[in-house]
């Protein structure tokens, strides 16, 4: 929680104003931020200076793991995070590759589970990583990559957190996640949860011990219409004790995650928080 608040304060105090062409808004921006999450000791990085809806973040991650490409499927899991980008993005609404209502195109999990090969067929990146780690293999390339410039025109949004690199030291699993862009007031509380949970769940299904998760953000920003709420409300609140995160121990394989797992298989204990803050969202 401390490192999250330090980043927010750094943006407010040291950020540069940048015009964002996609949203038509100005952003207060800093370059490069590094966050570390101690998964081994269950130090769950859930924001306490406002209420954080962690279940939606886990649901979104589960949708990526399953390779979903439709906002309706994400809603069924328990999150509406893709409704706007799938249905309110003018450029995507006029894109000939859009299949209809709720279609997201070839984004995130689609790339992770079905990366198109130039010579035909697809690569299931996640399956390969899970199989390797389960056998104790780390080829120094256990990388889940969502960033496919050749297919950007076939999806509603480029990936923000685009790379997850898993590494083994003995029987301890580590994760380095890289994010090109981060809406800090709205997106980062989701992204922190997802990086933490991804390492925790991958360690569990591959029979390894979780270590640390390292989260690099390249462009961290606060939109102009979010600044007052961050500076004058959230940053004036005292952080509270971190909660703990728990996963159903019966989840033992990638197939479990693909089939029967729901949000009921994850829970948080000891979450105390301040009141919610309604930050504006930019499509």
From Swiss-Prot:
Catalytic reactions on record: dUMP + (6R)-5,10-methylene-5,6,7,8-tetrahydrofolate = 7,8-dihydrofolate + dTMP
Species this chain originates from: Vibrio vulnificus (strain CMCP6)
Predominant location: cytoplasm
Keyword Transmembrane helix in annotation: no
Sites where the protein binds (6R)-5,10-methylene-5,6,7,8-tetrahydrofolate: 183, 282
UniProt GO cellular component terms: cytosol
Complex formation: Homodimer.
Family note: Belongs to the thymidylate synthase family. Bacterial-type ThyA subfamily.
GO biological process: dTMP biosynthetic process; dTTP biosynthetic process; methylation
UniProt EC number: 2.1.1.45
GO MF, any single term: thymidylate synthase activity
Record's protein name: Thymidylate synthase
Residues involved in dUMP binding: 22, 180-183, 191, 221-223
PANTHER family: THYMIDYLATE SYNTHASE, THYMIDYLATE SYNTHASE 1
């Amino acid at each position: 929680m401390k490192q999250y608040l330090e980043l927010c304060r750094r943006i407010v105090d040291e950020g540069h104003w940048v015009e964002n062409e996609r949203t038509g808004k100005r952003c207060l921006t800093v370059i490069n931020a590094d966050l570390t999450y101690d998964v081994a000791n269950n130090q769950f990085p859930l924001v306490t200076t406002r209420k954080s809806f962690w279940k939606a973040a886990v649901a979104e991650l589960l949708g990526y793991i399953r390779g979903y490409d439709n906002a309706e499927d994400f809603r069924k899991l328990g999150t509406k995070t893709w409704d706007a980008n799938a249905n309110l993005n003018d450029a995507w609404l006029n894109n000939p590759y859009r299949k209809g209502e709720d279609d997201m195109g070839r984004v995130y999990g689609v790339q992770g589970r079905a990366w198109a090969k130039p010579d035909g067929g697809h690569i299931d990146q996640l399956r390969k990583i899970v199989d390797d780690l389960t056998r104790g293999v780390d080829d120094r390339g256990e990388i889940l990559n969502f960033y496919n410039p050749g297919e950007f025109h076939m999806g509603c949004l480029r990936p923000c957190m685009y790379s997850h690199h898993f590494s083994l030291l003995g029987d301890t699993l580590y994760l380095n996640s890289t994010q090109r862009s981060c809406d800090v007031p709205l997106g980062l509380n989701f992204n922190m949860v997802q990086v933490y949970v991804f390492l925790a769940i991958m360690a569990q299904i591959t029979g390894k011990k979780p270590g640390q998760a390292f989260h690099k953000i390249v462009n961290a920003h606060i939109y102009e219409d979010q600044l007052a709420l961050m500076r004058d409300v959230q940053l004036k609140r005292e952080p509270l004790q971190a909660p703990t995160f728990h996963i159903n121990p019966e989840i033992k394989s990638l197939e479990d995650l693909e089939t029967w797992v729901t949000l009921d298989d994850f829970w948080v204990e000891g979450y105390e928080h301040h009141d919610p803050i309604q930050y504006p969202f930019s499509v």
